[in-house]
Amino acid sequence: MTTITPEAARLRLAQYLSPAFPTGGFAWSQGLEWAMDQGAVTRATLPQWLEDWLDHGAGWCDAVLLSLALRRGADHAELDDLARAMCPCARRLAETVEQGTAFAANVAALTGRPQSAAALPVAVGRACGCLPLPAGEIIGLYLQAQAAALISAAVRFLPLGPVEGQAMLAGLQPALLAAAARAGTADPKDLASATWGADLAAMRHETMVTRIFRS
Amino acid sequence: MRGRRLSGPMFDAIAPIRMQRSRGAASVRLGPRGIEDLAQSGSAKAMLPRMTAGRPEIVFLNTAGGLASGDRLDYRIELAPRTQALATTQTAERAYRAKDAPAQIRLHLQVGEGGWLDWLPQETILYDGARLGRETAVDLAPGAGCLLLEPIILGRLAMGETIRHLQLTDRRIVRQDGRMIHHDALALDDAALSRLHHPAMLGKARAMASLALIAPHAADLLEPARAVLDEPGVTGAASAPPGRLILRLLADDGWPLRRQVIRLLRVLRPDPLPRIWQV
């Protein structure tokens, strides 16, 4: 493959992880919609929900999966099995696989290299492993994109202004960087979570009668 | 010589004084006509009560009466092709304060082709300062399935105990025909404890249980399971990713959790409950 400068790699990464990159990310909320609907997450407590997601939940697990998928010699088929096996509910599985599959199809169209369907962090890691950028930078940007998608869901659901949402994202950045740095050197034994409340929310979202989001 | 100690409700709140680390290993192999091999050493025992009806039952017991720093417990079950069994534990497993190395539990559960294992252990009770690493590895042959329960209680609410320090890693990995199909790992440490009351974490719950049923018909049990998720004092939910039914339960205390688990087990399995799970 052709070599790419770090500056060009940064542009490519920002493109892949932009909300405009067509992966359908706007349609999912990881159960946040149910938690907001129940009043368990409000404008005041959303930052706390996001921190738990990042340090002890799906955000952390995605970061570790991405880190493993970025490594030289990574077995992406095996990591994809792992990513799917880790999803505790049907909608979370659909969320990560449908976005990852769309991501892989986009990358295949752009690069001319075929990419099989995979869970999102595995598809991103497989596509970005060749970029001459530190793993922590790629993971940090991925986590920020995921957090931004959750905040965007909250802006559409709650009384929460878009600028206030962006302020929440800015407030989360030190924690995003810290989690990205930890994930950069993590191993498969670090794939563990403690966010059962968020898992319950994602499961219960499946039985919501009226909903905006697919998860 | 191993450090044995008294156990039972009277002694639950008392930190054990243990001079030596305990080791235990118990291994059972069952075939369609019954027991094929049984090996046990140290503090681990495996009992096979004579059954008059239903599936054969395996009951594990840790005679050390709990787990402290550096203790290690290995349980192993091997079911031959077309063999069905139920395995459980004689008592709740207690993890006490551990100053140095965490206690370790390793479970290796193998189910042969067309076989079935119900792994329905009693609660794991974690005391303040407990350090425990548990790894449950399940290997299913093609056409095999299992039901896995894992109830965990944080301290004893009835005794007013609160947990200030904890290190728990509890990982369950199921492979079928060598391919990973289920991975569920819970990690609780001091950093997580400080946030435990958050709604994304455990909320007010101090008892929790996961249930995973791995079988082609798992999705058929989703609605029946959801229909009984209404035990007072328990918040639960279920979902069925392909080939799996997964339940998470959060409860105020161990008793409502146990009542909810029993009601779910009656829906999820055709056979009578093991004696230990009857109330």
Swiss-Prot record, chain A:
Entry keyword annotation includes Cell inner membrane: no
Superkingdom: Bacteria
GO molecular function: nickel cation binding
Cellular component per GO, a single term: cytoplasm
Keywords: Chaperone, Cytoplasm, Nickel insertion
InterPro entries: UreF (IPR002639), UreF_sf (IPR038277)
Location in or out of the cell: Cytoplasm
Quaternary state and interactors: UreD, UreF and UreG form a complex that acts as a GTP-hydrolysis-dependent molecular chaperone, activating the urease apoprotein by helping to assemble the nickel containing metallocenter of UreC. The UreE protein probably delivers the nickel.
Role according to the record: Required for maturation of urease via the functional incorporation of the urease nickel metallocenter.
PANTHER family, sorted: UREASE ACCESSORY PROTEIN F
Family according to the record: Belongs to the UreF family.
Family annotation (HAMAP family): UreF
Protein name, per record: Urease accessory protein UreF
Species: Paracoccus denitrificans (strain Pd 1222)
From Swiss-Prot, chain B:
Keyword Chaperone: yes
Organism domain of life: Bacteria
GO MF terms held by the record: nickel cation binding
InterPro entries in the record: UreD (IPR002669)
UniProt keyword terms in alphabetical order: Chaperone, Cytoplasm, Nickel insertion
Predominant location category: cytoplasm
Subcellular location(s) per record: Cytoplasm
A Pfam cross-reference name: UreD
HAMAP family with a match to the protein in the record: UreD
Function, as annotated: Required for maturation of urease via the functional incorporation of the urease nickel metallocenter.
Subunit (UniProt): UreD, UreF and UreG form a complex that acts as a GTP-hydrolysis-dependent molecular chaperone, activating the urease apoprotein by helping to assemble the nickel containing metallocenter of UreC. The UreE protein probably delivers the nickel.
UniProt record similarity statement: Belongs to the UreD family.
Name this protein carries in UniProt: Urease accessory protein UreD
Species the sequence originates in: Paracoccus denitrificans (strain Pd 1222)
Organismal lineage: Bacteria, Pseudomonadati, Pseudomonadota, Alphaproteobacteria, Rhodobacterales
Record gene name: ureD
